[in-house]
Amino acid sequence: MSSESSPDSTPDGLEARLRQSLPEARLIEPVIIPLAALLVSALIFSVFLLALSKSPATFFSLVWTGGFSSWFSIQNALQRAAPLILTGLAFAIPARIGLTLLGAEGALVLGGLSAAIVALPMQGSGLPALMILTVMVLAAMAMGAVWMGLAGWLKHARGVNETISSLLLTYIAIAIASFLIEGPFRDPGSANKPSTQPLGPDLRVGEMFGTSVHWGLAGGLVLAVVLWVVMTRTSFGFAARIAGGNLRAAQGQGLPVGRMMLACCAIAGGCAGLAGFFEVAAIHGQANASLATGYGFAGILVAFLARQNPLAVVPVAILIGALDASGGLVQRRMEMPDATMLVLQGIIFLTLLISDTFYGRLPFLTYHRGGDRT
């Protein structure tokens, strides 16, 4: 006697139940795909190490030791993560509206230089240190906002590609900073390395709660939360997502796309400028060529790995900061150049770019609850 099988026992029924048991694709894809990209990057880099007769196990063990194994290494990783959080936000916010800005490095450099310059006439004037620091922060953020806002204005008013314009503006910013540091604002005492006049000890913000981590980490955390709220819980953020998804539709709905572009670029520039302030007031104590160390470009990797989510930028920045912090240990123990970490970051970046093609294409991730396709 034949018996009819229940719908749930058929392959299609099992597949439907599996789909229903999965979280929504919009929640699971941004987690699984970047993690898979990181794993693939680690495998590719392991092949690279084996080709150099180096042990992948030793390398990743040293990365753990240099970035997470002790309180000292954790502080080192957090200190390097602080500017990455801010520059990651500087890329992530414009990306939410569909803009690809590469100008965080230039905004960071000019922001840090502006903070150092405005502090020069106020040092020794008797003004409270908190007031001077506030002016420095405002100057750095304003300079960064203006500089990256210029790329947004060129895009809106003249149709200039924002990726090209922001990248060119970065090189212009570095050239301007070099001229000012080596020329009118050079400290006569800086013989070997041209720098501005050093900041006084009351204007240094290098220790947070008695640790070696500077206050830039706290600033980055606060901004990440605030910008997450703005981009996900406000009408501005909703309108920005609409414009980022379909610019013509947003314009057809009468949304002020141009003003939103300028606002996102200004916010991004403010974040990068703030990173420049902390580089001056917490790390170097003056503006010099060390401001242009690549944090602005590393922020692109952070934002990509975080899928332009302001909150996700924080843990990703800590991960990349740990990689940077362990570079010296890898160099000493494995006799490899410090640029090895840049190779790994480049592999991660390329893998992330390739992984973007898988969004919406994996059958087991492209269903919402109930079995409807996304």
Regions found by a protein language model. Name each.
Residues 22-32, 52, 95-104, 127-191, ...:
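Short loop segments and helix-boundary regions at transmembrane helix junctions
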Residues 1-40, 46-47, 245, 252-259, ...:
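Cytosolic-side transmembrane-helix boundaries in multi-pass membrane proteins
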Residues 146, 209-286, 310-311, 315:
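Helix-loop-helix "hairpin" substructures at the membrane interface of multi-pass membrane proteins
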Residues 266-272, 278-346:
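Transmembrane alpha-helical segments in multi-pass inner-membrane proteins
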Residues 33-50, 87-91, 112-118, 140-145, ...:
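Hydrophobic core segments of alpha-helical transmembrane domains in multi-pass membrane transport
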Residues 45-53, 62-122, 137-163, 249, ...:
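Single transmembrane alpha-helix segments in multi-pass membrane proteins
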Residues 40-69, 180-181, 228-235:
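Structural signal for alpha-helical transmembrane segments and their membrane-water exit/capping regions
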Residues 162-233, 286, 367, 371-373:
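Transmembrane helix-bundle core of multi-pass membrane transporters
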